[in-house]
């Protein structure tokens, strides 16, 4: 069939249908979303859960959600800005922080469903592939699917660090090692040691050492927050190990204490009736006293 020019006449505009709003805004890939939210037809009223991972300049968000007609419902959420409670005070958007955030959301949802004692996940972090095995006499493992949104799924991306943390935390997420750091597309091989180094922030530590040797001014500028907190390259692995242990010990969400703000009043308070009468009486008395003083003078 040859080229057919689209004639934008009255009939064209009369039948024209606009795309979904979030497609017009460039926020949702509906081709992927359709395949992520549609449940098998032989599973009645069973939600299809998604592990939603989103990255921003200052934060990493991990949510477990399922779709309904009126909109998605968030079951559980974890954020990398919660990590300072576990000792990770800097580098809240790197691969190691993404792993910690994924681990946190996994332990939190399992604690909420009372499955945290049955499915402890992978406690010895080696960077190798780990798949959750369901227990024989008990509920199955919590299954969800990774939702990356519009992000690029390149090898070594932080999104897969969050997924690895969730898998090691005890969630059943279908995946392979092809997108983890340490996988070589040329050799079709996976080096778990490289992946483990990223999980414990050793790629950051190596860069700290290199930069400190080559350019001290650049080191002080790049790692100023690390220097202010007294964190050195050799301390990073210990920090993340302690964070993993702390997350497993207490993954529950803690609300921030409410700030008690002292209200400042910049306008005069409204007087009561008695106060107004007393004020007028005082003015009258002062005025009469002044007149009396003038007469006597």
Swiss-Prot record:
Domain of life: Eukaryota
GO CC aspect terms: cytosolic large ribosomal subunit; nucleus
Pfam families: Ribosomal_L18_c, Ribosomal_L5e
UniProt keywords, alphabetically: Cytoplasm, Nucleus, Ribonucleoprotein, Ribosomal protein, RNA-binding, rRNA-binding
Subcellular location: Cytoplasm; Nucleus
Main subcellular location: cytoplasm
InterPro entries named in the record: Rbsml_uL18_euk (IPR005485), Ribosomal_uL18_C_euk (IPR025607)
Molecular function via GO: 5S rRNA binding; structural constituent of ribosome
One GO term (biological process): translation
Recorded family membership: Belongs to the universal ribosomal protein uL18 family.
Role: Component of the ribosome, a large ribonucleoprotein complex responsible for the synthesis of proteins in the cell. The small ribosomal subunit (SSU) binds messenger RNAs (mRNAs) and translates the encoded message by selecting cognate aminoacyl-transfer RNA (tRNA) molecules. The large subunit (LSU) contains the ribosomal catalytic site termed the peptidyl transferase center (PTC), which catalyzes the formation of peptide bonds, thereby polymerizing the amino acids delivered by tRNAs into a polypeptide chain.
HAMAP family per the UniProt record, alphabetical: Ribosomal_uL18_A
Assembly, per entry: Component of the large ribosomal subunit (LSU).
The protein, known as: Large ribosomal subunit protein uL18
Organism the protein comes from: Aedes aegypti
Gene designation per UniProt: RpL5
